[in-house]
From Swiss-Prot:
NCBIfam families: guaA_Cterm, guaA_Nterm, PRK00074.1
A Pfam family annotated for this UniProt entry: GMP_synt_C
Gene: guaA
Active site location: C86 (nucleophile), H172, E174
EC number(s) recorded for this UniProt protein: 6.3.5.2
GO molecular function, one term: GMP synthase activity
Entry protein name: GMP synthase [glutamine-hydrolyzing]
């Protein structure tokens, strides 16, 4: 991952903490660029990156376990400020000559510390609530260090070597439970590391455009466009950088939401004057999906067919050297560090063929999802597009449970459009993480007018979440739910019942398939 030399950087080294991405995000929220890297990064690479500061993350291991994660101690001699968090503090203590031992019992939860007003705690009250999560404890600090915070359970809640600008805290400042955690991190970034905080989406665009132009030159780029936020932002950024050297392929597999295909062509083809090839492949996809009910088989068929269609269209183009992808920083982190854990595979449409001889361009692979949205706004993409609902690669194919037919797709498409319209009218778009309708394949008896019906049931799924890893069902007002239900039953053919999913994640997932 190349990075402009003039850009201030805080380097976060990963020791397996569940909060490691949070550290990176907190730093970026301060206007300072931050990257998460494996703890085994070389001294030479650190020197090349030239960070203003280094943060050692927490982790689940003991520093005394066989094979426990460590770093090259030369890091402490680079003259770069270092902050160790939990495991990072214990490792620092051990490597610099202090003593660490296994605690009698793991300390987990809120604790109260008493802090001195030094650089790290500058401007903060002496007594504050923090979040502890550790099984080792420091019993003797290295030479040159002093205690800057203690607690009822430990004499060494925070330590510092002011001369070498090396710090350690036995709690997690990056989590919300730590009362002044953001302030502590800001003190480290601004006061200790002397960062100015000038990283913005505006200068990110300037830097990325220059990088794209240098990489591409006068050659051509191909972009697979789904109409989703990530690929749309990538396409607009590339178009801003290289104009007509970019060609986008938009595969319409017939599993899109109502009006989505036309919207992509109108907003991006006409609105941004981009060269987009729309491939109408509905019949091709539906013929492959005929008679298939198993969700994994459906997903695989849709993914494979997308690849084949894209490959066929790409083969018609000549002199294309680059392929652009909307890879996010979360994808890079999960695939790039030894401590990464894969929680759940995403609904990607599938990898592109290995024999496609393109160089990759991934201009947003240093950004988190919320940063991509901010980038989209800065690029001039309308807010209603930037804040569109997340949509899985297989599209409505996994929101029709069981076999997919045109009639079933129409029910989901129309009911989902009604749901989104009412949510928008009620001003709830930003309050609900994700919302959509599903067709669970259940028919039930109903009465419409003077006639008995035996028609489909539509399910509504709406959840609140911070990151999508866990979620709770949204507490939508009953009157709003009644409005949604009434409109669906009255406006969508062959539906006589609407149900609301009130299950959290876990145990269920957000999507039904």
């Amino acid at each position: 991952m190349e990075m402009a030399k003039e850009q201030e950087l805080i380097l976060v080294l990963d020791f397996g903490s569940q909060y490691n991405q949070l550290i990176t995000r907190r730093i970026r929220e301060m206007g300072v660029y931050s990257e998460l890297h494996d703890h085994e990064i070389s001294i030479e690479e650190i020197k090349r990156m030239n960070p203003k500061g280094i943060i050692l993350s927490g982790g689940p291991n003991s520093v005394y376990e066989e094979g426990s994660f460590t770093i090259d101690p030369e890091i402490y001699n680079l003259g770069i400020p270092v902050l160790g968090i939990c495991y990072g503090m214990q490792l620092t203590t051990k490597l610099l000559g202090g003593k660490v031992e296994r605690a009698n019992e793991r300390e987990y939860g809120k604790a109260t510390i008493n802090a001195k007003s030094d650089e790290l705690f500058f401007g903060l009250p002496s007594e504050q609530t923090v979040w502890m999560s550790h099984s080792d404890k420091v019993i003797e600090i290295p030479e040159g260090f002093e205690v800057i915070a203690d607690s009822p359970s430990t004499n060494y809640a925070a330590i510092e070597d002011k001369k070498r600008r090396i710090y350690g805290v036995q709690f997690h400042p990056e989590v919300r439970h730590t009362e002044y955690g953001n302030d502590l991190l800001r003190n480290f970034v601004r006061r200790v590391c002397n960062c100015t905080g000038e990283w913005t989406m505006e200068n990110f665009i300037e830097i990325e455009i220059e990088k794209i132009r240098q990489q591409v030159g006068n050659r051509k780029v191909l972009c697979a466009m789904s109409g989703g936020v990530d690929s749309s932002v990538v396409a607009v950024l590339l178009h801003k950088a290289i104009g007509d050297q970019l060609t986008c392929i938009f595969v319409d597999h017939g599993l899109l939401r109502k009006g989505e295909g036309d919207m992509v062509m109108e907003q991006f083809g006409e609105g941004f004057d981009m060269n987009i090839i729309r491939v109408n492949a509905q019949e091709r996809f539906m013929s492959k999906l005929k008679g298939v009910s198993d969700p994994e088989r459906k997903r695989k068929i849709i993914g494979n067919e997308f690849v084949y269609v894209f490959d066929d269209e790409a083969a018609k183009l000549t002199d294309v050297d680059f392929l652009a992808q909307g890879t996010l920083y979360t994808d890079v982190i999960e695939s790039g560090t030894k401590t990464a854990q894969t929680i759940k595979s995403h609904h990607n449409v599938g990898g592109l063929p290995e024999d496609m001889e393109f160089e990759l361009i991934e201009p947003i692979n240093t950004l988190f999802k919320d940063e991509v949205r901010a980038l989209g706004i800065e690029l001039g993409i309308p807010e209603h597009l930037v804040w569109r609902q997340p949509f899985p690669g297989p599209g409505l194919g996994i929101r029709v449970l069981g076999e997919i037919t045109e009639d079933k797709l129409e029910i989901v498409r129309e009911s989902d459009a009604i749901l989104r319209e009412v949510i928008r009218e009620e001003g709830l778009e930003r309050d609900i993480w994700q919302y959509f309708t599903v067709l669970p394949g259940i028919q039930s008896v109903g009465v419409m007018g003077d006639y008995r019906t035996y028609d489909h049931t539509v399910g509504i799924r709406a959840v609140t979440s911070i990151d999508g890893m866990t979620s709770d069902f949204a507490r939508i007002d009953w009157e709003v739910l009644q409005k949604i239900s009434s409109r669906i039953v009255n406006e969508v053919d062959h539906v006589n019942r609407v149900v609301y999913d009130i299950t959290s994640k876990p145990p269920s997932t957000i999507e039904w398939e």
